[in-house]
Amino acid sequence: MYRTYRKMKKVFFLFILILLGHLSAGPEETVKEFFQDFINEDILAINKNSDSPFIYIMGKNAVLEEKYSDAINFNGLKRDGWSYSKINTSKVLYDDDDTSMVQVNFSRLDKDNEIILTGDVTYLLVNKDGNWKLKGGFSPNLTTLGND
């Protein structure tokens, strides 16, 4: 009886591991996690949740960097008054097993919770080994990543 119990316990444990592997964040949740990492200025998490190279197209300007963290300058954003960002709306535009596009309307706010910028960005995500990663961002009206 004890042997049967141990076998059942192992099977249950394997089932849980497999289930957890399939419960990774979807594209929209990945973008929300990315925004939280951005607010926390967590460079390691930002790079973990984005793919390399990363491209950002803002109007007619294109930024191609090895890592997303190479494209962003938090000190520059803070000089412009940025304290944090928030997602106003998000919507999955396209989704298959390998790629996804998520449209986001967001605001940047200052320390007094005043909006200093509202923008739209569409993120391209790729599925790498079961994990969604940001590959690129496309924005008609995002003016700066803090590098001006």
Tell me what each language-model feature is.
Residues 1-11:
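Positively charged n-region of N-terminal signal peptides that target proteins for export
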Residues 11-20:
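Sec-dependent N-terminal signal peptides
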Residues 22-25:
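Sec/Tat signal peptide C-region and signal peptidase I cleavage site
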Residues 42-57:
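Short, well-ordered alpha-helical segments enriched in acidic and aromatic residues
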Residues 50, 60-61, 104-108, 121-123, ...:
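A mature extracytoplasmic/lumenal domain signature
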Residues 71-115:
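Surface-exposed, charged secondary-structure patches
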Residues 116-148:
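Short beta-strand edge/turn micro-motifs at domain boundaries
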